[in-house]
Amino acid sequence: MEKSGLVAKEGYPFMAIFIGVAAVSSALSWYGIVQFVLWVLAGWCIWFFRDPERHSDAPEDAVIAPADGRVVAIREMEKGPLTDEPVRMVSIFMNVFNVHVNRAPIAGTVTKISYHPGKFVNADLDKASIENERNVLLMESPAGVKMAFQQVAGLVARRIVCRINEGTVLQRGERFGLIRFGSRVDLFFPMDAEISVKLGEMTHSGVTQMGRLKGKES
């Protein structure tokens, strides 16, 4: 699994800017309140891009949370993204205080990635899943089960980062990207899968068990 430092590498440019401006304010002896605010913003930026190690002891067939946040939707759909089969969608909303690094919900091969430009409405709203900028990924597990999930940009988030390509093999819980400054991740479960979470439940990426998949019948 990919190793990471204390913060996600995508945050380095932002941290450099905030820390640089704060340092200049101190060197030039700007007003104390200005220096304080700038250093607070620099600290918040570092905290926002934090990337803690996560481990899960969930069963092998379990689907784990791809993101920190709150479950804001659980509903059935006649057709899932990148497949023609009905699915049950579980949506996780990430606010600006959550860890924003995204992790693979299952182990397997990324068979397709599809980027869709779009709007930037509040990611807490259901319509964000179909109207907003989003990046859809389809994975196939070692048992032959296909599962899609998508990164959705939000009102503040205007940048989806996906570090992988089609054909990439991921371990469950492995980092694959992030979304900057508040966003949403949707999971699309096969209809025969078990869902373990409820509306309003808080999730931790790489840890929380979202449900369980059934192996493909021979």
Swiss-Prot record:
Q: Which residues carry this modification: Pyruvic acid (Ser)?
A: 183
- Co-factor remark: Binds 1 pyruvoyl group covalently per subunit.
Provide the site residues for: Cleavage (non-hydrolytic): 182-183
* Pathway annotation: Phospholipid metabolism; phosphatidylethanolamine biosynthesis; phosphatidylethanolamine from CDP-diacylglycerol: step 2/2
Q: According to its UniProt record, which residues of this chain constitute the active site?
A: 183
Query: What keyword terms does UniProt attach to this protein?
Result: Cell membrane, Decarboxylase, Lipid biosynthesis, Lipid metabolism, Lyase, Membrane, Phospholipid biosynthesis, Phospholipid metabolism, Pyruvate, Zymogen
Could you tell me where this protein is found in the cell?
Cell membrane
Cell membrane as UniProt keyword: yes
Q: Which domain of life is it from?
A: Bacteria
SS bonds (residue pairs): none
Record's comment on post-translational modification: Is synthesized initially as an inactive proenzyme. Formation of the active enzyme involves a self-maturation process in which the active site pyruvoyl group is generated from an internal serine residue via an autocatalytic post-translational modification. Two non-identical subunits are generated from the proenzyme in this reaction, and the pyruvate is formed at the N-terminus of the alpha chain, which is derived from the carboxyl end of the proenzyme.
Instruction: Give membrane topology per the record.
Output: Peripheral membrane protein
| Name of a matching Pfam family | PS_Dcarbxylase
Which terms in the GO cellular component ontology are assigned?
Answer: plasma membrane
Which cofactor(s) does the record list?
pyruvate
GO biological process terms, semicolon-separated: phosphatidylethanolamine biosynthetic process
Q: What EC number(s) does its UniProt record assign?
A: 4.1.1.65
Q: Which reaction does it catalyse?
A: a 1,2-diacyl-sn-glycero-3-phospho-L-serine + H(+) = a 1,2-diacyl-sn-glycero-3-phosphoethanolamine + CO2
What Gene Ontology molecular function terms does this protein carry? phosphatidylserine decarboxylase activity
Task: Enumerate the HAMAP family for this protein.
Answer: PS_decarb_PSD_A
How is the quaternary structure described? Heterodimer of a large membrane-associated beta subunit and a small pyruvoyl-containing alpha subunit.
Family in the record: Belongs to the phosphatidylserine decarboxylase family. PSD-A subfamily.
Q: What does this protein do?
A: Catalyzes the formation of phosphatidylethanolamine (PtdEtn) from phosphatidylserine (PtdSer).
- Designated name of the protein: Phosphatidylserine decarboxylase proenzyme
Q: Which organism is it from?
A: Magnetococcus marinus (strain ATCC BAA-1437 / JCM 17883 / MC-1)
